[in-house]
């Protein structure tokens, strides 16, 4: 039996509340305040699935939110000192930072928590009228009869490990939109489906990936 699903309609649905998805929603709202925009975030809260900290160059943020310094942003700690080292088996060798390409020099940048930046960007987006739904993972792409993307479906809830519906089962929603933006990150499963379905990687160099580790340090507040 086909599951009956509730549906919602938007001008734009964005999959993923990372920096790209949040910045997209803010720019769209700045350009056209009447747009009806929602963001789906699989994490329990915005920032929950952000991998790491960040040495942050503010140029893009300066363009997006020029007065970010006056809006209680979490961007506070400037880079005060940096070293570039070549590591050997027993020793390291320092290289003068002024000889490095400008893209590798961080003296004007900030050290931030990327998760905190995303949370702050989320408040800026919501202040503009963007709707953000944490805890809702987009699990399926919805196509029309002409193979055009017309939205996404969120995951069903209340399913046991064997795949059976529990008493608490709730079907996912169909989120329809005129434009669907996929900002899941480098290996999002919906993004991979789109790439495969429409041969977007044809003639392109294969993507390269690195392994990331997330380590959380708790530091007394008086030390930062």
Residue ranges and their predicted role:
Residues 49-51, 96-97, 192-195:
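Short, solvent-exposed loop/turn and secondary-structure capping segments
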Residues 4-6, 174:
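Short, flexible hinge/linker loops that cap or flank conserved catalytic cores
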Residues 20, 45, 187:
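Conserved Rossmann-like nucleotide-cofactor binding loop
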Residues 115, 124-224:
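Predominantly flavin-linked oxidoreductase catalytic cores and closely associated redox partners
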Residues 103-123, 133:
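Short beta-strand to alpha-helix junction loop
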């Amino acid at each position: 039996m086909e599951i009956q699903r509730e549906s919602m309609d938007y001008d734009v649905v964005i999959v993923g509340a990372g920096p790209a998805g949040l910045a997209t929603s803010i720019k769209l709202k700045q350009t056209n305040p009447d747009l009806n925009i929602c963001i789906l975030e699989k994490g329990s809260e915005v920032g929950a699935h952000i991998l790491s900290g960040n040495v942050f160059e503010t140029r893009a943020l300066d363009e997006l939110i020029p007065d970010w310094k006056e809006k209680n942003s979490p961007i506070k700690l400037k880079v005060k000192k940096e070293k570039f080292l070549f590591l050997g088996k027993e020793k390291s060798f320092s290289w003068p930072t002024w000889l490095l390409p400008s893209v590798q020099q961080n003296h004007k940048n900030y050290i931030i928590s990327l998760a905190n930046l995303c949370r702050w960007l989320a408040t800026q987006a919501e202040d503009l009228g963007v709707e953000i739904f944490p805890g809702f993972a987009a699990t399926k792409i919805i196509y029309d009869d002409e193979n055009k993307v017309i939205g996404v479906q969120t995951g069903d809830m209340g399913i046991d490990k064997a795949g059976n519906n529990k008493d608490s089962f709730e079907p996912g929603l169909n989120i329809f939109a005129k434009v669907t933006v996929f900002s899941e990150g480098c290996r999002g499963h919906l993004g991979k489906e789109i790439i495969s379905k429409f041969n977007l990687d044809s003639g392109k160099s294969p993507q390269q990936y690195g392994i990331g580790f997330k380590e959380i340090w708790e530091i007394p507040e008086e030390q930062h």
